[in-house]
């Protein structure tokens, strides 16, 4: 984006990740690419805060669908995440789920702009090769409609530090059929529209 400026760097085993300030009027908005998984994503939240002082994070990306009828063609606004990862337990006391208190802000944005969305729970896991049918069915019974690898951990980091997290997802692969279905995973991973939606959400935040 023209006018963007690199304001910091984070060094990880996979390389150097830039923190980029965007030319957004009247708001201090930046972006960074996070590696997959809660430990890396949550750690980068800590690093970005140390470098920039940022306390509001909009997390967006792809996910697996546990209920393709509910998620097809819609963005997923997460209101709770099942804590099937390790990071969150180092930040807050144990519980099955963690709430996302900002979910209504994201919902209101999609509603106001007539963008298709669904509100629901997600299942955050460290082990994508252990997304078994029995585990999936259990999570579906509890109301989960998606599976991903970051939200529970990142929300725990935000809660511990007194920050705010605004997550939304786009479903890619489909897990609720007879067999795994790649679905729209390629597009969900690479479509730029989520970035531009995140920038618009950033503009309305009180920060």
State where each predicted segment sits.
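Active-site rim beta-loop-alpha module in soluble metabolic enzymes
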Residues: 95-143
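Glycine-rich beta-alpha junction loops
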Residues: 64, 123-128, 153, 170-174
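Generic non-transmembrane alpha-helical segments
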Residues: 105-113, 157, 197-205
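Flexible, glycine/charged-enriched surface loops at secondary-structure junctions
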Residues: 6-11, 115-120, 207
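Zn-dependent metallopeptidase/amidohydrolase metal-coordination segment
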Residues: 152-187
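Metabolite-binding pocket within alpha/beta catalytic cores that recognizes anionic/polar moieties
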Residues: 1-100, 104
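His/Asp/Glu-rich mid-to-C-terminal helical/loop segments that flank catalytic regions of hydrolases
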Residues: 177-207
């Amino acid at each position: 984006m023209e006018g963007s400026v690199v304001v910091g760097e984070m060094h990880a085993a996979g390389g150097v990740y830039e923190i980029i300030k965007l030319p957004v009027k009247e708001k201090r908005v930046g972006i960074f690419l996070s590696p997959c998984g809660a430990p890396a994503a949550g750690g980068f939240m800590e690093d970005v805060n140390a470098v920039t002082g940022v306390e509001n994070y909009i997390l967006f990306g792809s996910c697996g669908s546990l209920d393709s009828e509910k998620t097809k063609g819609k963005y997923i606004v997460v209101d709770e995440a099942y804590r099937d990862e390790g990071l969150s337990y180092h930040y807050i006391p144990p519980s099955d789920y963690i709430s996302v208190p900002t979910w209504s802000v994201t919902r209101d944005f999609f509603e106001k702009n007539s963008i298709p969305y669904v509100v629901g729970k997600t299942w955050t896991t460290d082990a994508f090769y252990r997304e078994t049918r029995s585990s999936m069915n259990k999570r579906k019974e509890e109301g989960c409609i998606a599976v991903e690898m970051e939200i529970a951990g990142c929300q725990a980091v935000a809660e511990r530090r007194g920050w705010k997290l605004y997550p939304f997802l786009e479903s890619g692969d489909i897990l609720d059929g007879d067999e795994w279905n790649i679905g729209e995973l390629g597009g969900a991973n690479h479509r730029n529209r989520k970035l531009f939606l995140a920038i618009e959400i950033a503009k309305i935040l009180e920060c």
